[in-house]
Regions:
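Bacterial N-terminal signal peptides that target proteins for export
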Residues: 2-10
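General helical structural elements
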Residues: 11-12, 148
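N-terminal signal peptide c-region/cleavage motif recognized by signal peptidases
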Residues: 18-20
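Pepsin/retropepsin-fold aspartyl endopeptidases
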Residues: 23-171
Length: 171
């Protein structure tokens, strides 16, 4: 085979591989339904490519020490599907780290914890900074560290799939 033909064949193979990989990438809407696991608390999640770390609407945040380690207790308050009284669940998690967030009102130190979240059929263990997001439209914000495990975000779509991690959570 001539060198020019070999290069063309190699280029065509790479182009084909690239196209097939691109087609296999999952696309998600900029708003998706999610479950906080293992409690299966339903929450709307905003997929935000502008944020690095994911954030969770946490109320009554109480930091404490447990066996010499930093822990946090907090409430997650979410509306129910039937729009009746919201449901509140208390979580306790080990603090993985603290992040400092600077804004117009000054700086703020927030705890970061690991949480399991279900999106579509994917069960992910991700890091979330805790903050009272009660004045925000979406209680869960998924940043780039989480989005890299999902796929591309299509800003023209919302609610592309329902959470289906029930069987996965039992494992």
């Amino acid at each position: 085979m001539k060198p020019v033909q070999s290069r063309r064949l190699a280029f065509a193979a790479l182009l084909s591989l690239s196209a097939s990989c691109h087609a296999a990438t999952e696309h998600w809407g900029w708003i998706e339904q999610s479950w906080l696991m293992p409690e299966r608390m339903q929450a709307k999640a905003k997929l935000d490519t502008g944020a690095l770390t994911s954030s969770l609407d946490a109320r009554n945040i109480h930091r404490y020490k447990k066996d010499g380690e930093r822990w946090v207790r907090f409430d997650v308050v979410l509306p129910t599907a039937d729009s009746k009284a919201p449901v509140s669940v208390t979580f306790e998690r080990k603090v993985l780290r603290l992040i400092k967030v600077r804004g117009a009102g000054g700086s703020d130190s927030r705890p970061v914890v690991a949480m399991d979240i279900c999106l579509g059929a994917k069960l992910l263990r991700e890091q979330f900074s805790l903050r009272d997001r009660g004045n925000m439209n979406y209680p869960v914000l998924l940043g780039r560290r989480t989005l890299e495990h999902l796929g591309a975000v299509d800003v023209s779509r919302t609610f592309t799939r329902k959470p289906t991690c029930g069987a996965l959570a039992a494992q």
